[in-house]
Amino acid sequence: MENVNKQSFQEVLEYVRMYRLKNKLARDREDNNRKIRDNQKRVLLLDNLNQYIRDDMSIQDVRTIIESMREDYEKRVDDYMIRNAEISQQRREIREKMKEQKQAHEVLLKKE
């Protein structure tokens, strides 16, 4: 009986750990979504700025810098999207483990 209680306690601790990790991943995903939006706005801003800059203003170097910045922001957006996909996959895996653990715990309780 003591082994069952000890095992149940360990399972509860593991379940709590997974639940907290799942919530942390959800917060990370939302943070990444915010960063994606921010960087997409920056890309739009740079596109708009680039429309106003003309060659007769003799700032070709500024255009080069703006294009470089735009590429950097686009890369960041891509990186955050990839990270979101990874986080979503981790959350799915944790949800499945939690579901399995909950079912195993219910079976264990029925045996008692």
Swiss-Prot record:
Transmembrane segments: none annotated. It comes from the Bacteria. It comes from Pasteurella multocida (strain Pm70). Keywords: Coiled coil, Cytoplasm. Belongs to the pole-localizer TmaR family. InterPro entries: DUF496. One of its GO terms (cellular component) is cytosol. Residues 70-111 form a coiled coil. It is found in: Cytoplasm. Pole-localizer protein involved in the regulation of several cellular processes. This is Pole-localizer protein TmaR. Its main location: cytoplasm. The lineage of its organism: Bacteria, Pseudomonadati, Pseudomonadota, Gammaproteobacteria, Pasteurellales.
